[in-house]
Amino acid sequence: MVQRNILITGSNRGIGLELTKQFLTKGDQVFALCRKSSSDLVLIKPTRILEGVDVLDSNSIRDVSTKLLGTKIDILINNAGILIPDNLQSLEEENVFTQFLVNALGPLKMVKAFLPSLNTNAKLVFLTSRMGSVGDNNSGAYYGYRASKAALNAIAVSLALDLSPKGISVGIFHPGMVATQMTGGQGIPTIESARGLIERIESLNLNNSGKFFHQNGEELPW
């Protein structure tokens, strides 16, 4: 298998860390982007750790894209995200805006910054959530998070359409309910989620670009 250059945001813990680990095991080069590294990330020895990358900060995104000039990226995985639980009583405008900036605008800024570095037939991966599905909403609440992930889904579909002439495919993947800091440790193990996500990434092509999949292979409604 040809060694690939893979960029992963939010790689210092949770799903991002496990994806980094599993891609390294496959023999790929992984560039681990994060706000602050972790002992777990250092332990698995990514190709390169790039700290200080905050998707809220356009300058930090621009700086890291400059540092990696000349490196052709085969897979860009937008994993960094935030969840702030809310309901009608606890809803705060600032929290809604923050989730939009991190979960929707952040990944779009990453794509814009790294577009010149994407290899021929590169893959863009967006870790979204089925909570961003309108048709699958059966429980309500989580207004800011749901809206931000729905916005991310819309952005990713537009990117799939805009970038298909360049041979770039776009994956929109729900990782499942995963036991991470974001979910309070509830859900499936990160190793299981990452394994399924990698299967979806490996099978991603222009024919299924822009579709919404669960990591287990189920196609999800918008």
Indicate where each model-derived feature is located:
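Structural signature of the Rossmann-like NAD(P)-dependent dehydrogenase/reductase core
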Residues: I8-T9, N78-N79, K123-S129, S169-H174
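Catalytic loop of short-chain dehydrogenase/reductase
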Residues: I82, N87-Q99, T120-S164
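N-terminal Rossmann NAD(P)H-binding glycine-rich loop of SDR-like oxidoreductase domains
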Residues: N12-Q22
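Conserved glycine-rich Rossmann-like NAD(P)H-binding loop of the short-chain dehydrogenase/reductase
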Residues: K26-L41
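Rossmann-fold cofactor-recognition segment
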Residues: K45-N59
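A short, exposed helix-loop element centered on a Lys and neighboring polar residues
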Residues: V111-K112, V157
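C-terminal helical subdomain
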Residues: I172-P175, T180, G184-W222
